[in-house]
């Protein structure tokens, strides 16, 4: 929900500023209740791209719907594609609660976002899409597993999972965030926070405004 709220905030700012940009907002939202047809560990499910996914952990459900949204969004070959998600606890372990982890397949887009974050005091930290860890998502019964073997590098492997659904020629940025303030600070009250929203808007405004 935190990632969806962040992207809604970005869309609201873009529309309020009347930027000359075609913006498409995709929010994958599904029921997540336990029922007789709920998915189970070791299930194999298809995706919009046609890739099959082994369910290694049912708690890694967010990436299962986000990957379909990314594949759909990439089908239009956008000038940039950005997603935000409260995807992993591993990103919090690595960077704490105040710094969203940025994963990006395009150095120019990453530099633009980081520079925008500095301008508007909306910090982030770039993390690697280390290709060597892709092997940790291998599955014996499907094209890919939804979690890594062993659990190490969880934020990286989650981002690598999503990368499978984004063509290399589509500039893409993925934010793995907390979207919450545990304590109040000046300008940042305790509670939900649209982390990276101001930075994303500032980058879009500079590029398309």
For every predicted segment, state its role.
Residues 1-209:
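A generic structural signal for tightly packed, nonpolar segments enriched in small/aliphatic residues
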